[in-house]
Every structure is written in C-alpha cells, then in structure tokens.
Amino acid sequence: NCRDIGGYETRDGRKVQTGLIYRSGELPRLTDEDMEKLRALGVKTVVNFLTPEEVEYRGKDRLPEGVREIILPITGEIDDVPDAAAQLVEARKTGDFRKFPPAFNTQVHKDLVTGVADEQYSALFEILADKSNYPLVYHCSHGVHRTGTATALLLHALNVPWDTVRMDYLLSNETRRAEVEPRIEQLEGLAASRPMSDTDQKENSEAIRAFYLLQPDYIDASRDGAVEKYGSLDKYLEKGLGLNDLKIENLRDLSTAPQN
C-alpha cells in the first residue's frame, strides 16, 4: 500500500507534485527489489507511526543505507480500548477482533484528530515543512487508519477537495486487495479454532471485515471529529496542530505547483 500522494488537483487550480511525498504500510519486509525502488525514488526520510509493541511484533523497517528514520509512535486509548495498538497486535495473532467492533473504525479516525495523535501529526507537518527531508515516506502498519488520516489532513492542508481526499483513502481497498482477502480468511480461520459461540463467530467475522475493508464514513469521521471539537478542519490544523496561515502557505509552495 505504498503510493505517491501527488497528482491531485487543488481547489485553486494547482496540482500536488509527484515524487515528493509517499504514504505506505509497514516496511520491515521489503525485498531487495523494493529497496532498489526506494533508492530510485531518492527517499531521504521515513516517518514511522508504529508503537514499540508493533515494532517488536513486525520488526524494524528495512531501509536503504542513508535514509533517515523518524519514529513518531501513535498509541493511546481509542474507543475505550486501552492501548489499542497493543491490543490489535494480539488480535492479529489470535483472530479475535471482538474488542474492535465495526464502530471502532469510525471512532478511531475521530479520536486521531481529537487528541490521540495531535503531537505526532504536528511533528509530521514540521518535518514536511523542511524541503531537505524530501522525498519522504510516512507509514503505519497497513497504511490505513493512522496513515490514512495523516494523508487526509495533508491533502486538505494542500487545498485538495474532500471528495478527492475520500477517493484517495478508499484507494487502499484496491491497492491492498491481494493482501487483504487472504488475510481475512486467515484471521477467520484462527478465530474458528477459539471457543466462541456461533453468534460470537459471526460478530467477530464482521469486525475483521470492517477493520480491513475501508468505508467512506471512516475517513469522514476524522473530518467530523475535527468539526465537532474545533468548528472546522482548518481550525483543527491551526489550533490542534499549530499550522498557521504562513506554515500552510509554505507547505503549499513546497509540494504543489501550477498546472501546465
């Protein structure tokens, strides 16, 4: 699920530049061919949102020599699930997703913009404000919840329409299809061996599918959460992340350009 966020048109007729900013899922299992692709892209900086527990479970990022890695772990309590990232590591081991019902997926996106990840997202924007950090990759485990919300905030800051932001978010369903379908089957198989009633098995299967198959209301919940707390997404960027008009203008100058 690694892809360029560039190419999108902005409301003021500019275009997000390609070859500068990439969003991704985990990077520990890169093949030699993948490493060569990163080298060819000239990636200088990788921002990693994974927690220490996730890194222990998944492994450290495998990166070309000379790439700077910045660790900004996003953890915390989400939807009344203490230390949700660690709990998800366990769910992925056992196939038991009953602590993460379908409603979790909208709540996690809302929580990410109402306190859980403000410090990390603010730091990401500071990194993006420095041209010497480009080209840059930021990632979490699957490139979906934490990375998807970060991308939505970034594209919004670059003046990309929300319909386009939503489309980019849902694109992960296509880019991850070959990975997700067998993963769902594997998790359902793990869960089937656990002592659950038929009703619990059905609810657990629904939770697994809701977690791995993205819906538009997930990313809309990030926008709605910011609106509920701050009044607008722009106000969240300003008050929650410390992005004033000058910083946003600088970011747009760095990563958007007039269309030919």
Regions found by a protein language model. Give the residues of each.
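Cys-dependent protein tyrosine phosphatase-like superfamily
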Residues: 1-137, 142, 150-260
